[in-house]
Protein backbone atom coordinates (compact mmCIF):
# COMPACT_ATOMS: atom_id res chain seq x y z
CA UNK A 1 0.00 0.00 0.00
CA UNK A 2 2.94 2.35 0.55
CA UNK A 3 3.57 2.37 -3.21
CA UNK A 4 0.13 3.95 -3.70
CA UNK A 5 0.94 6.70 -1.22
CA UNK A 6 4.40 7.33 -2.68
CA UNK A 7 2.92 7.65 -6.16
CA UNK A 8 0.12 9.90 -4.89
CA UNK A 9 2.67 12.07 -3.09
CA UNK A 10 4.66 12.32 -6.31
CA UNK A 11 1.57 13.52 -8.16
CA UNK A 12 0.96 16.17 -5.49
CA UNK A 13 4.55 17.41 -5.72
CA UNK A 14 4.29 17.50 -9.51
CA UNK A 15 1.02 19.43 -9.25
CA UNK A 16 2.65 22.02 -6.97
CA UNK A 17 5.65 22.32 -9.29
CA UNK A 18 3.38 22.78 -12.33
CA UNK A 19 1.41 25.56 -10.67
CA UNK A 20 4.70 27.23 -9.70
CA UNK A 21 5.86 27.03 -13.33
CA UNK A 22 2.57 28.62 -14.35
CA UNK A 23 3.06 31.44 -11.84
CA UNK A 24 6.60 32.02 -13.06
CA UNK A 25 5.47 32.03 -16.68
CA UNK A 26 2.81 34.69 -16.29
CA UNK A 27 4.99 36.72 -13.92
CA UNK A 28 7.53 37.03 -16.74
CA UNK A 29 4.75 38.72 -18.72
CA UNK A 30 4.27 41.30 -15.97
CA UNK A 31 1.23 39.69 -14.34
CA UNK A 32 1.28 39.22 -10.57
CA UNK A 33 0.18 35.65 -9.84
CA UNK A 34 -1.87 34.88 -6.71
CA UNK A 35 -0.86 32.04 -4.39
CA UNK A 36 -4.29 30.40 -4.31
CA UNK A 37 -4.62 27.89 -7.14
CA UNK A 38 -8.32 28.68 -7.59
CA UNK A 39 -7.55 32.40 -7.80
CA UNK A 40 -4.67 31.67 -10.18
CA UNK A 41 -6.86 29.68 -12.56
CA UNK A 42 -9.57 32.35 -12.45
CA UNK A 43 -7.05 35.11 -13.17
CA UNK A 44 -5.46 33.15 -16.03
CA UNK A 45 -8.89 32.53 -17.56
CA UNK A 46 -9.73 36.23 -17.36
CA UNK A 47 -6.40 37.60 -18.63
CA UNK A 48 -5.04 34.89 -20.93
CA UNK A 49 -6.08 36.72 -24.10
CA UNK A 50 -3.83 39.65 -23.17
CA UNK A 51 -0.74 37.41 -22.99
CA UNK A 52 1.57 36.77 -25.98
CA UNK A 53 0.44 33.85 -28.16
CA UNK A 54 3.39 31.64 -27.24
CA UNK A 55 2.71 32.24 -23.55
CA UNK A 56 -0.96 31.37 -24.09
CA UNK A 57 0.08 28.04 -25.62
CA UNK A 58 2.33 27.28 -22.65
CA UNK A 59 -0.44 28.24 -20.21
CA UNK A 60 -2.90 25.90 -21.96
CA UNK A 61 -0.40 23.03 -21.87
CA UNK A 62 0.39 23.55 -18.18
CA UNK A 63 -3.29 23.70 -17.22
CA UNK A 64 -4.02 20.57 -19.26
CA UNK A 65 -1.12 18.83 -17.53
CA UNK A 66 -2.27 19.81 -14.05
CA UNK A 67 -5.81 18.65 -14.86
CA UNK A 68 -4.44 15.19 -15.68
CA UNK A 69 -2.44 15.16 -12.45
CA UNK A 70 -5.51 16.12 -10.39
CA UNK A 71 -7.50 13.36 -12.10
CA UNK A 72 -4.77 10.88 -11.09
CA UNK A 73 -4.84 12.10 -7.48
CA UNK A 74 -8.63 11.73 -7.40
CA UNK A 75 -8.37 8.18 -8.73
CA UNK A 76 -5.76 7.24 -6.13
CA UNK A 77 -7.99 8.71 -3.41
CA UNK A 78 -10.81 6.45 -4.64
CA UNK A 79 -8.53 3.41 -4.48
CA UNK A 80 -7.35 4.28 -0.97
CA UNK A 81 -10.94 4.89 0.14
CA UNK A 82 -11.90 1.39 -1.00
CA UNK A 83 -8.95 -0.07 0.89
CA UNK A 84 -9.84 1.87 4.03
CA UNK A 85 -13.37 0.47 4.02
CA UNK A 86 -12.01 -3.08 4.23
CA UNK A 87 -9.36 -2.44 6.92
CA UNK A 88 -10.59 -2.39 10.52
CA UNK A 89 -7.64 -0.26 11.72
CA UNK A 90 -8.38 2.40 9.11
CA UNK A 91 -12.07 2.33 10.02
CA UNK A 92 -11.24 3.05 13.66
CA UNK A 93 -8.97 5.92 12.68
CA UNK A 94 -11.66 7.46 10.48
CA UNK A 95 -13.86 7.92 13.54
CA UNK A 96 -11.54 10.78 14.49
CA UNK A 97 -12.51 14.23 13.25
CA UNK A 98 -10.09 15.28 10.53
CA UNK A 99 -8.90 11.78 9.64
CA UNK A 100 -10.22 10.59 6.28
CA UNK A 101 -9.57 7.42 4.27
CA UNK A 102 -6.31 8.61 2.70
CA UNK A 103 -4.83 9.69 6.04
CA UNK A 104 -6.00 6.51 7.77
CA UNK A 105 -4.50 4.27 5.08
CA UNK A 106 -1.24 6.22 5.12
CA UNK A 107 -0.89 5.85 8.89
CA UNK A 108 -1.60 2.12 8.80
CA UNK A 109 0.83 1.62 5.91
CA UNK A 110 3.59 3.63 7.57
CA UNK A 111 3.39 2.81 11.30
CA UNK A 112 1.22 -0.32 11.43
CA UNK A 113 0.10 -0.89 15.03
CA UNK A 114 2.31 1.97 16.28
CA UNK A 115 4.36 -0.33 18.51
CA UNK A 116 7.56 1.47 17.52
CA UNK A 117 6.38 4.49 19.53
CA UNK A 118 6.10 4.53 23.33
CA UNK A 119 3.19 6.96 23.35
CA UNK A 120 1.22 9.41 21.25
CA UNK A 121 3.51 12.32 22.07
CA UNK A 122 6.44 10.41 20.63
CA UNK A 123 4.52 9.85 17.39
CA UNK A 124 3.55 13.54 17.22
CA UNK A 125 7.20 14.49 17.76
CA UNK A 126 8.34 12.04 15.06
CA UNK A 127 5.87 13.67 12.67
CA UNK A 128 7.31 17.11 13.46
CA UNK A 129 4.09 18.36 15.06
CA UNK A 130 5.69 19.43 18.35
CA UNK A 131 7.33 22.84 18.88
CA UNK A 132 11.10 23.11 18.99
CA UNK A 133 12.72 24.32 22.22
CA UNK A 134 15.35 27.00 22.64
CA UNK A 135 16.85 29.02 25.48
CA UNK A 136 16.61 32.78 25.79
CA UNK A 137 17.75 34.70 28.83
CA UNK A 138 18.28 31.48 30.73
CA UNK A 139 14.69 30.39 30.13
CA UNK A 140 13.46 27.53 27.98
CA UNK A 141 11.00 28.63 25.32
CA UNK A 142 8.96 26.92 22.62
CA UNK A 143 9.51 27.78 18.96
CA UNK A 144 7.97 26.66 15.70
CA UNK A 145 7.16 23.03 14.99
CA UNK A 146 10.21 20.98 14.05
CA UNK A 147 8.77 19.60 10.78
CA UNK A 148 10.85 16.48 11.30
CA UNK A 149 9.80 12.98 10.28
CA UNK A 150 7.38 11.99 7.54
CA UNK A 151 6.29 15.15 5.71
CA UNK A 152 3.54 13.30 3.80
CA UNK A 153 1.80 12.10 6.98
CA UNK A 154 2.28 15.48 8.62
CA UNK A 155 0.71 17.25 5.64
CA UNK A 156 -2.29 14.90 5.67
CA UNK A 157 -2.89 15.49 9.39
CA UNK A 158 -2.52 19.25 8.98
CA UNK A 159 -4.97 19.27 6.06
CA UNK A 160 -7.39 17.26 8.17
CA UNK A 161 -7.02 19.72 11.03
CA UNK A 162 -7.81 22.61 8.69
CA UNK A 163 -11.01 20.86 7.62
CA UNK A 164 -11.92 20.46 11.30
CA UNK A 165 -11.54 24.22 11.81
CA UNK A 166 -13.69 25.01 8.78
CA UNK A 167 -16.42 22.65 9.97
CA UNK A 168 -16.30 23.93 13.55
CA UNK A 169 -17.25 27.44 12.45
CA UNK A 170 -20.66 26.13 11.36
CA UNK A 171 -21.43 23.99 14.42
CA UNK A 172 -22.30 24.60 18.06
CA UNK A 173 -21.47 21.25 19.69
CA UNK A 174 -18.96 21.05 22.55
CA UNK A 175 -16.02 19.96 20.40
CA UNK A 176 -16.64 22.69 17.80
CA UNK A 177 -16.85 25.33 20.52
CA UNK A 178 -13.53 24.09 21.91
CA UNK A 179 -11.96 24.33 18.44
CA UNK A 180 -13.22 27.88 17.94
CA UNK A 181 -11.97 28.94 21.38
CA UNK A 182 -8.58 27.41 20.54
CA UNK A 183 -8.37 29.60 17.43
CA UNK A 184 -9.26 32.68 19.47
CA UNK A 185 -6.65 31.90 22.12
CA UNK A 186 -3.76 30.68 19.98
CA UNK A 187 -4.40 31.92 16.45
CA UNK A 188 -5.31 29.98 13.32
CA UNK A 189 -2.08 28.17 12.48
CA UNK A 190 -1.20 27.25 16.05
CA UNK A 191 -4.70 25.85 16.43
CA UNK A 192 -4.27 23.82 13.24
CA UNK A 193 -1.01 22.33 14.52
CA UNK A 194 -2.52 21.66 17.95
CA UNK A 195 -5.42 19.72 16.42
CA UNK A 196 -3.08 17.82 14.07
CA UNK A 197 -0.86 16.89 17.03
CA UNK A 198 -3.87 15.81 19.08
CA UNK A 199 -5.07 13.64 16.21
CA UNK A 200 -1.60 12.09 15.95
CA UNK A 201 -1.79 11.15 19.65
CA UNK A 202 -5.30 9.74 19.25
CA UNK A 203 -4.23 7.81 16.15
CA UNK A 204 -1.41 6.25 18.15
CA UNK A 205 -3.86 5.20 20.87
CA UNK A 206 -6.28 3.74 18.33
CA UNK A 207 -3.57 1.73 16.57
CA UNK A 208 -1.74 0.72 19.74
CA UNK A 209 -4.73 -0.38 21.82
CA UNK A 210 -6.90 -1.62 18.96
CA UNK A 211 -10.46 -2.50 19.89
CA UNK A 212 -9.76 -1.60 23.53
CA UNK A 213 -9.41 2.06 22.54
CA UNK A 214 -12.47 4.18 23.22
CA UNK A 215 -12.57 7.52 21.47
CA UNK A 216 -14.80 9.23 24.01
CA UNK A 217 -12.36 8.48 26.82
CA UNK A 218 -9.48 10.03 24.87
CA UNK A 219 -11.26 13.15 23.70
PLM-predicted stretches and their roles:
Residues 2-5, 9, 16-23, 56, ...:
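Non-catalytic, well-ordered alpha-helical scaffold segments
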Residues 3-92, 217:
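Glycine-rich, often acidic, oxyanion-interacting loops/wings at catalytic, nucleic-acid
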Residues 18-19, 73, 112-116, 162-172, ...:
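Short helix-capping/linker segments at secondary-structure and domain boundaries
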Residues 25, 32, 83, 171, ...:
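Short, polar/charged, Gly/Pro-enriched helix-capping and turn/loop motifs at alpha-helix termini
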Residues 137-138, 176-219:
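Low-complexity, acidic/Ser/Thr- and charged residue-rich accessory regions of DNA metabolism proteins
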Amino acid sequence: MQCLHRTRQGFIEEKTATYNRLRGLISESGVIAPQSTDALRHMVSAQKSSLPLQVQQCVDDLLEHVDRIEANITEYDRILSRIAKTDHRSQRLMKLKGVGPTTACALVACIGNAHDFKNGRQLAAWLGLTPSQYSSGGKSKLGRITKAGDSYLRTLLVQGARSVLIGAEKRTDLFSRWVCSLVERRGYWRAVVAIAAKNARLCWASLHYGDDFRLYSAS
